[in-house]
Amino acid sequence: MKKISILFSAILVSATLSGCEMANLRKTEVVKPELPVATDAKCDCSHVTGATDAIKLTEKNTDTPLVPVQCIEPKPTETKIITPKEAPKIADYGLLKPVRWEDVDGLDVDSGNGAQLSLAWPAWMQSCTALGARPMWQKACSAANQLSSETNSKPSAEAVQAYLKQYFSIYKTTNVDGSDSGLITGYYEPLLKGSRTKSAKYPYPLYLQPNDLITVELDSLFPELKYKRVRGRLVGNKLVPYYNRAEIEVDSPPIKGREFIYIDDIIDVFFLQIQGSGLVQLENGEQVHVGYADQNGQTYNSIGRVLIERGELTVANASMQGIKNWARNNMNKLRELLNNNPSYVFFRELPAGLPGPLGALGVPILGERSVAVDPKFVPLGAPVFLSTTEPNSNKPLKRLMMAQDTGGAIKGGVRADLFWGAGFEAGAKAGAMKQAGKIWVLLPKEFVMNSNQVLR
């Protein structure tokens, strides 16, 4: 990917600050012997769950109805250059409210939920591979490595609890309006069927990142615009929008030659772009991990919402499975429907034999132990305690997890997307996950806010 750090005299700020600037999905990748540099998470405005189409993962793959999540598009404004004074401030975790350990129901070995503490330990050790060298995390991660060494990487729930209380303080996340409850959704890693050769059986390509796709990282110009970027291509000396879905999915695509795998089902390709990563089962039995590489910069538009607005589906049946069923019964209308979403995601093949996809932290995410958050409000890599309910249920789900991923629709202090793992069962849970919940964040006692105030 080409990255430009020069100042364009006319950057459309309204575009850069739109709700969906990246792909509508979670970009996850697989683990290498040496951990890769963390990449930006997918932007998935459908990702009501971790990023679903019409309604994020809620559409993801379940028959469970979802409430459509709208990507808010900016109102037309005059073009202007944002100066550092005008630019929005980066959050400094000021919405985190200190609480006592005993105030958090379920985060104690005596609560009947103690086993969950030790089960979260492998995910925490993954976080430490990325955080351990950072000053504010170094002491806690060093102690974690020592505890793992002493217990053969299997500390008891009591040992984990004692460790957490010794090295961490706990904070309740809140929203801007002061409320402490928010939406908890889910995402997963799908399984597709494909081939390295195009054929009548496998006609739909996955594309590598195009050579002419340019990304402008706005924080190189304005630190206040961290996580903001624009994408496009050069025509002469002018940066113009990159090709949209309708322009790419034609008989002679402008990015021809970047195909690397072909899939048997166009619907599966579309939803793979929403999830951001997946497993492709090849004809010879080989399984290939594919992960998010980049996105064309076009705004994500939920096709589920389009179907609801047209009266083709109701909110009650606009789940991911409901959308798939509609698509298979209306193949003559499918291409036009998909083109309503101009966003397009490019992939890359990941190393074989890896334990799972990589999240935005740059470490492998683990099923039911990793969660996507908004890094403006929750430090990436931190342990978080999630209190919500099981998908489509009132059964409590209280679990220590790790904030190891992000998502374009995961915005706000009390907002999370739970990674359920890979395959059909995980997809069913992810698609049904649209629950209310609360979140607590565990931060090292040395952790310092942007305001230079030590959290105690």
Give the residues covered by each predicted segment.
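Gram-negative bacterial Sec-dependent N-terminal signal peptides
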Residues: K2-C20
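Residue-level signal for mature regions of secreted extracellular proteins and peptides
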Residues: V13, P36-A38, T64, R134
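Bacterial Sec signal peptide processing site at the extreme N-terminus
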Residues: S14, S18-V37
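Secreted/extracellular small peptides and ectodomain modules produced from precursors
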Residues: S18, A41-C43, V69, Q126, ...
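C-terminal soluble interaction/assembly domains
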Residues: E21-L25, N113, G353-R456
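General secretory precursor processing signal
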Residues: A23, S46-V48, P74, L131, ...
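N-terminal low-complexity, Pro/Thr/Ser-rich intrinsically disordered segments
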Residues: A38-T49, A54-D105
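Secretory/export targeting leaders with adjacent low-complexity proregions
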Residues: P88, Y93-P351
